[in-house]
C-alpha cells in the first residue's frame, strides 16, 4: 500500500465507523450507565441482593461495551495524525505500523458490528442449549458428545459460565442427549442460529470395516427467562419422574434418585436436571427450564410461525440440517443457509465457530429465512 491508498482505506473505515456509531449510540450507553451508577449509590442498594447483582452485572457490561467503542473511536482518529505525518515524510517503520493498525481496527469494528445485530428482545439472555442424538446409532451419540464439547469450548473462550444440567450417556459411547445453561451477555443472541440439525460424515471409529458413515444430531437453543416473567403452569399438566443421575463423571455425580425429569403433557415438552445435590433443587431448576421453553413456544405462536419449540418437527435426518461437517474423504464444514464454509475442522470442533455465528447473523439481518 502506498500512502494515498492507506489514506483512502482510512476514509472508508472512518465512514463505516461513523455509520456504526449511529447504531451503537455511545451517548445512550453513557446515560444508562449514569442511571445505574445513581441506583448503586443508594445506601439500600444491596437490600435486594438478586436485583443488585443484576444491576451490577448490567453496569459492568455497559461499561465494557462503552470502553470498547471509545477505544476504537480514539484509534480511528489517532490514525489520521499518523497518516498526515506519512504524507509529510515517508517513514517505512511508521508506514508498517499504520498498515498493521488499520487491519486491527477493521477487526474491532467488525466485532462491534456483529454485536449490533443482536437487537431482539431476548438476545441479551443466557442460553439453554440441548444436543440430542438422531439417526446413526452409537456414531450419532459420539457426534452429539463432540458437539457438546464444541459449544462448551466456544463458551469458555468467550468467558461465559457453562453449567451442565442434564447428561444422558449412551450405553456404548457418547451421549444420547445433554443440556447446558450458558451464562453471559448475549449468549442466546449469539447461539440462536445454532438451532437445527448438524450432519457428520466420517469414517466411523466404531466400524471394523472402516466405512464412511453419516450421522445426525439436533441442537435446540432457547433463552433463559427472568424469574419475574409469569408463565402459568398447572400441576395436573405435569408428569414428574425421578431417576439416578448419570453425569459425565467425577466425584460429585449423585448416587441417589435425585435427578428430575418433567414432562409437560399438553405440549410434550420434556426437561431434565441432575446437576444439583437435592431432588428439590433439581426440580426447581427443571421447572425454570420448562418455563423458558413454554415462554419461547408462546412467542413463536404470537409470531404465527408454525413451529414447535424445538424447531420444525422434522426427523433428525437429511431434510432439516443446517450445517454439514465432512471429515472424510475431504475436510469441510459448511453452513447450508449462509454458504459459509471452512476446511479447518479441528478449529471448529475446538469451539472456533464465531465466523459461522457472524455469517448467520448477517444473513438473518438481510432477511434470510
From Swiss-Prot:
Keyword Cytoplasm, does the record have it? yes
UniProt subcellular location: Cytoplasm
* Molecular function in Gene Ontology: translation release factor activity, codon specific
Q: Which InterPro entries match?
A: PCRF, Pep_chain_release_fac_I, Pep_chain_release_fac_I_sf, PrfB
CC terms in the record's Gene Ontology section: cytoplasm
Q: Source organism's superkingdom?
A: Bacteria
Query: What does the UniProt PTM comment say about this protein?
Result: Methylated by PrmC. Methylation increases the termination efficiency of RF2.
Which Pfam families does the UniProt record give? PCRF, RF-1
Chief localisation class: cytoplasm
Which keywords has UniProt assigned to this entry? Answer: Cytoplasm, Methylation, Protein biosynthesis
> N5-methylglutamine modification sites?
251
HAMAP family for this protein:
Rel_fac_2
Q: Which family does it belong to?
A: Belongs to the prokaryotic/mitochondrial release factor family.
* Function text: Peptide chain release factor 2 directs the termination of translation in response to the peptide chain termination codons UGA and UAA.
> This chain belongs to which protein, by name?
Peptide chain release factor 2
Instruction: Please report the organism this UniProt entry assigns to the protein.
Output: Sulfurihydrogenibium sp. (strain YO3AOP1)
> What's the gene?
prfB
